[in-house]
Amino acid sequence: MGSFSITLGFFLVLAFWLPGHIGANPVYSAVSNTDLMDFKNLLDHLEEKMPVEDEVMPPQALSEQTEEAGAALSSLPEVPPWTGEVNPPLRDGSALGRSPWDPSDRSALLKSKLRALLAGPRSLRRSSCFGGRIDRIGAQSGLGCNSFRYRR
């Protein structure tokens, strides 16, 4: 009980003593007002020396640039406007009356790909009760969880 009261007393002293010594110190307090004024004068001086963009490029040069861009875009093939339809037009399977990605075809394709992934050698290695390195050791010694899968 004595050590608990000493520890509690120590934490109480720290709780009341530290807030006076630890506080938020803003970053700007480290910079003096004269430094801030010097920085502001430097920025004003740089703004005076920097030309305004409208003065740098006259309107005639801007119109020439837009004409050049329009000529470059006119050589591209025209894209038909969007009609608002969600489904794309039928392509290969339109003669048969069904789309090339019929739901039954898609599910059969997905099932076959999933079976191929699960039957692959890498997925068989991952279906163990230990890590891959321990399974390789177990496969060589015949003591691992899935040692029957690794014998070749």
Curated annotation (Swiss-Prot):
Q: What is the effect of changing residue 126 to A?
A: Does not affect maturation and cleavage by CORIN
Q: Where is this site: Cleavage?
A: 122-123, 129-130
Q: Which residues form the signal peptide?
A: 1-24
Chain positions covered by the region annotation Important for degradation of atrial natriuretic peptide by IDE: 146-150
One of the entry's Gene Ontology molecular-function terms is: neuropeptide hormone activity
List the residue ranges of the region (Disordered).
76-106
Protein's GO biological process = cardiac muscle hypertrophy in response to stress; cell growth involved in cardiac muscle cell development; cellular response to angiotensin; cellular response to hydrogen peroxide; cellular response to mechanical stimulus; cGMP biosynthetic process; cGMP-mediated signaling; female pregnancy
What PTMs does it carry? The precursor molecule is proteolytically cleaved by CORIN at Arg-122 to produce atrial natriuretic peptide. Undergoes further proteolytic cleavage by unknown proteases to give rise to long-acting natriuretic peptide, vessel dilator and kaliuretic peptide. Additional processing gives rise to the auriculin and atriopeptin peptides. In the kidneys, alternative processing by an unknown protease results in the peptide urodilatin.
Tell me the InterPro entries matching this sequence.
Answer: Natr_peptide (IPR000663), Natr_peptide_CS (IPR030480), Natriuretic_peptide (IPR050787), Natriuretic_peptide_atrial (IPR002407)
What positions belong to the pro-peptide in this record?
A: 25-122, 92-102
UniProt xrefs under SMART domains: NAT_PEP (SM00183)
Q: Say what happens when this gene is deleted.
A: Mice display increased arterial blood pressure which is dietary salt intake independent. During pregnancy, increased blood pressure is observed, leading to late gestational proteinuria and smaller litters. Impaired trophoblast invasion and smaller spiral arteries are also observed in 12.5 dpc embryos. In 18.5 dpc embryos, mice display fewer trophoblasts and smaller arteries in the decidua and myometrium than those in wild-type mice.
Phosphoserine found at: 128
- Write out the coiled-coil annotation as residue ranges: none
Ordered alphabetically, the record's keywords are: Cell projection, Cleavage on pair of basic residues, Disulfide bond, Hormone, Phosphoprotein, Secreted, Signal, Vasoactive, Vasodilator
Instruction: Provide the Gene Ontology terms for cellular component.
Output: brush border; cell projection; cytoplasm; extracellular space; glycinergic synapse; mast cell granule; perikaryon; perinuclear region of cytoplasm
Q: Which cysteines are joined by disulfide bonds?
A: 129-145
Q: Which family does it belong to?
A: Belongs to the natriuretic peptide family.
Designated name of the protein: Natriuretic peptides A
Organism the protein comes from = Mus musculus (Mouse)
